Amino acid sequence: MNFREKYGQWGIVLGATEGIGKASAFELAKRGMDVILVGRRKEALEELAKAIHEETGKEIRVLPQDLSEYDAAERLIEATKDLDMGVIEYVACLHAMGQYNKVDYAKYEQMYRVNIRTFSKLLHHYIGEFKERDRGAFITIGSLSGWTSLPFCAEYAAEKAYMMTVTEGVAYECANTNVDVMLLSAGSTITPTWLKNKPSDPKAVAAAMYPEDVIKDGFEQLGKKFTYLAGELNREKMKENNAMDRNDLIAKLGKMFDHMA
């Protein structure tokens, strides 16, 4: 599918520097879109922009922005107000692992600003813009962490659950329009962050996917599903989890990350 023809000229990837964000930026360009890269590290973004342009020939812009800043959403909206925006992809997330009370609360406040506040403002703005012109797409990158309580990662799991339920609800509200909204959930994905905190569960390691595969799989579902979990092994794992007693599931997941205690 040519995203430019269906949704508009520009795609923007929030959290584009590496992993799923980087893979998304390449894939949007391959699907015909000019792309705006948003992240904190300007030099890394510029290097990525050059690589995407050289491979695809598309126009790539760099927009350095810390999404935890109070006015981050307003700055991004202002920067894109005169562009034909077609696809918004919110990949960015902050997380902290460890016993809940041992994490500095300032870290949780920073996570909230990235995972909820900036995300919500951008979702609210662009869905309104897209529905007004009856064209566009918003993709939220979710995580298996948001599908259940997760010991030693409790705040992050709760915030990903928020992103999941809001996106799915808005997706249904847009069902009878030409605006496509989807939650694309990734399980274990081989990114720098994942490698730092690799789980001890062999099944989770075996199910790990490369970012490029997550995105190619997920993009094929845009416009077809409200919510999608990439990877057959991840879907099998989720069926197993859903069949468990919730108390047993929480204990099982906690044991996977006991080393974080």
Curated annotation (Swiss-Prot):
Record field: temperature dependence: Optimum temperature is 40 degrees Celsius. No activity is detected above 60 degrees Celsius.
Entry keyword annotation includes Transferase: no
What switches on expression, per the entry, is described as: Induced by bile acids, when grown in the presence of deoxycholate or chenodeoxycholate.
Q: Which domain of life is it from?
A: Bacteria
Active site location:
Y156
Q: How does activity depend on pH?
A: Shows a maximum of activity at pH 8.5 in the oxidation of ursocholate, and between pH 7.0 and 8.0 when tested in the reduction reaction of 3alpha,12alpha-dihydroxy-7-oxo-5beta-cholanate, with a gradual drop on the alkaline side and a sharp drop on the acidic side.
Give the record's GO biological process terms: bile acid catabolic process; lipid catabolic process
Name the Pfam families on file: adh_short
**InterPro entries from the UniProt entry:** NAD(P)-bd_dom_sf, SDR_fam, VLCFA-Steroid_DH
Residues the UniProt record annotates as site (Transition state stabilizer): S143
Residues that hold NADP(+) according to the record: T17, E18, G19, I20, G21, R40, R41, D66, L67
Residues carrying the site annotation Lowers pKa of active site Tyr: K160
EC number of this enzyme: 1.1.1.201
Task: Mention one GO molecular function.
Answer: 7-beta-hydroxysteroid dehydrogenase (NADP+) activity
The record's comment on protein family reads: Belongs to the short-chain dehydrogenases/reductases (SDR) family.
Q: By its UniProt entry, which PANTHER family does this protein fall under?
A: RH59310P (PTHR43899:SF13)
Tell me the function of this protein.
Answer: 7beta-hydroxysteroid dehydrogenase that catalyzes the reduction of the 7-oxo group of 7-oxosteroids, such as 3alpha,12alpha-dihydroxy-7-oxo-5beta-cholanate, 7-oxolithocholate, 7,12-dioxo-lithocholate and dehydrocholate, to the corresponding 7beta-hydroxysteroids. Is also able to catalyze the reverse oxidation reactions.
Q: How does it assemble?
A: Homodimer.
The name under which this protein is listed is 7beta-hydroxysteroid dehydrogenase
Origin species, per record, is Clostridium sardiniense
Q: What is the lineage of its organism?
A: Bacteria, Bacillati, Bacillota, Clostridia, Eubacteriales
The gene name reads hdhb
